[in-house]
Design a protein with these regions (language model features):
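Glycine-rich beta-to-alpha active-site loop
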Residues: 93-108
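Short beta-strand/turn micro-motifs composed of small residues
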Residues: 51-52, 104
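Catalytic-core regions built around general acid/base machinery
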Residues: 35, 85-96
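Glycine-/small-residue-rich active-site loops that bind phosphorylated ligands and cofactors
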Residues: 20-21, 55, 107-108
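Conserved CoA-thioester-binding segment of acyl-CoA-metabolizing enzymes
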Residues: 1-51
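Glycine- (often His-adjacent) and acidic-residue-rich active-site loop
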Residues: 52-88
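Alpha-helix capping and helix-loop boundary segments enriched in small/acidic/polar residues
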Residues: 23, 77-80, 106
Length: 108
C-alpha cells in the first residue's frame, strides 16, 4: 500500500492502494508514520516527495473502514483508534524537520 525508496538525498513515498481512491486505511496510517520516522532519522535524506501511482492521489481518511469498525464494536474506543493514528501522523508531519513536496501526475 505504501512504497518508498531513497535516492540522491530524496526519499520518495508513494501511495499505492488498490481500490478505495487511495483512502488512508488504519494500516496505511501506521505504515506512513513508520516510514516518515525512519526518514527523519536518516541524515542523508534532505527532502521527501509524497506521490501516488494511482489515478486518484488520495481521498483522505477511509471513512468506510471507520464506519465498519465502529459498527462492529459500537464503542467509542473503536472509533478513536483510527483517529488517534491519523492524529499521530498529522502531528508528525506538522513537526518534521524534513520538507515534504507532494505532487500527483494524473493517470488516465
Amino acid at each position: 500500500m505504501i512504497k518508498h525508496y531513497i535516492k540522491d538525498h530524496v526519499a520518495v513515498v508513494t501511495l499505492s492502494r488498490d481500490g478505495g481512491l487511495n483512502a488512508l486505511s488504519s494500516q496505511m496510517l501506521v505504515d506512513l508514520l513508520k516510514i516518515y520516522k525512519e526518514i527523519e532519522k536518516n541524515d542523508d535524506v534532505k527532502v521527501v516527495v509524497l506521490n501516488s501511482d494511482r489515478r486518484d492521489f488520495c481521498a483522505g481518511g477511509d471513512l468506510k473502514e471507520v464506519y465498519e469498525s465502529f459498527s462492529k464494536c459500537n464503542d467509542r474506543n473503536c472509533l478513536m483508534s483510527y483517529f488517534t493514528k491519523e492524529y499521530d501522523l498529522d502531528l508528525f508531519l506538522a513537526t518534521t524537520k524534513k520538507p515534504t513536496i507532494t505532487f500527483w501526475l494524473m493517470k488516465r
